[in-house]
């Protein structure tokens, strides 16, 4: 049994949420093929984060993946990770987690103030811009509206209550839970880390857990925590910490694989010297990803031998993205999937050849593709991070065991984040 289970819809989300626990000394493993193996029911582990790879799945398929993960890995505390920009199957996955965990109440707080994500008056924003206008492909800014299709009742916890602290949150949550047939989803405002701390501690008090602020434990409600990497920093894990240590490899060399086409990632790529970047032809990557990746690996091996660091991507500007999508439309292929395969093939060839000791993986889909290519089903978080939302880990099993891995969601980081990752490793 796990002390805590994190269920995320993509790999970078599982990583940055798990980091919220690892940074406080908890032993955190992140599993890619989380639904494929049934664990030993007599063993007790600390924190397991499972990537269901369901962000782009049909809602029913995503819900089933979440249900299977929660049922496969029983845990004293369940944390349903959702994207901090509310992409993916948010409502269907939260509903599935509520049912599978047997929760009376779900505390939904996707804010991540350290990365510019905030919620006020129920409306979610990115660096002050309403979510629907922030360029993430999400049409709704109001968290309550996003959850409106839930099979459960949706309530709102306003900022004024949250700002009053954990005891006020506990009381408000108790009232909301008592005023409706359970379960109930509570959409929470938060604009600072202190607000997220109050939400976590108030909910834990309602669940009967002791909290450091002195909020009075008042019951035995089963609480499902729903949030991004922000709330995870403040949720308490039951049981004693059991740190998990995997010795990192001493091999030199760092390879960055950049699959995200988020505008912020493109800006970060522009800050890296052209001499370090191998760009795959995006149209060729869609037509023949394996061959394109093989050719890219040859160039990467030469560069790593000379410089000990390299970056591979298939998109440095909007023109590259359009080229890939044009060929995909002609051939009936899926551009993102084909390009991801090409990047993973290039990375796999470079790792087999130059054998860099460290990887930087930007974008959840390409991170999963690369690690799958390496037969690396599980990562151990070290508790260290290059920046907010950019955690460090080590491959915990498989042929690549010991390889250091840093992951970054496409929308996270500053202009120098990719460069800083290369420097840090």
PLM region descriptions:
Residues 18-19, 90-92, 117-124, 168, ...:
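Short acidic, glycine/serine/threonine-rich loops at helix termini
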Residues 246-339:
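Redox- and metal-dependent alpha/beta enzyme cores, enriched for Fe-S-associated oxidoreductases
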Residues 334-365, 371:
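Extended C-terminal subregions enriched in glycine
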Residues 34-37, 58-70:
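Glycine-rich, highly charged phosphate/nucleotide-binding loops
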Residues 45-54, 296-298, 305-308, 393-425:
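A structural-propensity feature for long, helix-poor, extended segments
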């Amino acid at each position: 049994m796990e002390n805590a289970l994190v269920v995320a819809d993509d790999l970078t989300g599982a990583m940055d949420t798990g980091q919220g626990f690892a940074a406080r000394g908890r032993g955190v493993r992140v599993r890619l093929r989380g639904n494929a193996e049934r664990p030993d029911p007599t063993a007790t582990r600390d924190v397991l984060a499972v990537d269901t790879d369901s962000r782009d799945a049909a809602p029913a398929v995503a819900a089933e993946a979440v249900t299977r993960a929660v049922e496969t890995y029983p845990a004293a505390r369940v944390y349903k990770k959702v994207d901090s920009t509310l992409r993916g199957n948010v409502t269907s996955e939260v509903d599935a987690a509520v049912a599978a965990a047997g929760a009376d109440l779900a505390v939904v707080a996707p804010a991540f103030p350290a990365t510019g994500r905030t919620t006020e008056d129920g409306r979610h924003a990115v660096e002050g811009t309403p979510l629907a206008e922030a360029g993430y492909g999400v049409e709704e800014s109001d968290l309550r509206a996003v959850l409106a299709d839930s099979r459960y009742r949706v309530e709102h916890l306003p900022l004024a209550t949250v700002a009053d602290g954990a005891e006020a949150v506990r009381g408000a949550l108790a009232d909301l839970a008592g005023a409706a047939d359970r379960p109930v989803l509570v959409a929470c405002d938060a604009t600072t880390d202190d607000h997220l701390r109050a939400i976590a501690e108030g909910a834990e008090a309602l669940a009967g857990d002791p909290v450091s602020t002195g909020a009075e434990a008042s019951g035995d409600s089963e609480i499902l925590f729903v949030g991004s990497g922000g709330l995870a920093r403040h949720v308490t894990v039951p049981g004693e910490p059991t740190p998990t240590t995997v010795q990192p490899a001493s091999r030199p060399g760092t390879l960055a694989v950049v699959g995200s086409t988020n505008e912020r990632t493109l800006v970060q790529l522009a800050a890296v010297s052209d001499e370090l970047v191998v760009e795959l032809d995006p149209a060729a990557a869609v037509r023949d990803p394996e061959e394109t990746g093989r050719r890219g690996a040859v160039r990467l091996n030469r560069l790593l031998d000379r410089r000990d660091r390299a970056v591979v991507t298939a998109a440095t500007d909007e023109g590259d993205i359009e080229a890939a999508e044009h060929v995909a439309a002609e051939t009936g292929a899926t551009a993102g999937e084909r390009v991801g395969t090409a990047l993973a093939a290039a990375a796999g060839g470079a790792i087999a050849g130059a054998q860099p000791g460290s990887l930087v993986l930007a974008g959840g889909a390409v991170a999963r593709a690369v690690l799958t290519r390496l037969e690396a089903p599980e990562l151990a978080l070290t508790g260290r991070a290059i920046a907010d939302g950019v955690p460090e880990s080590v491959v915990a099993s498989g042929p690549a065991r010991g390889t250091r891995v840093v992951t970054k969601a496409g929308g996270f980081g500053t202009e120098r984040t990719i460069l800083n990752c290369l420097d840090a490793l």
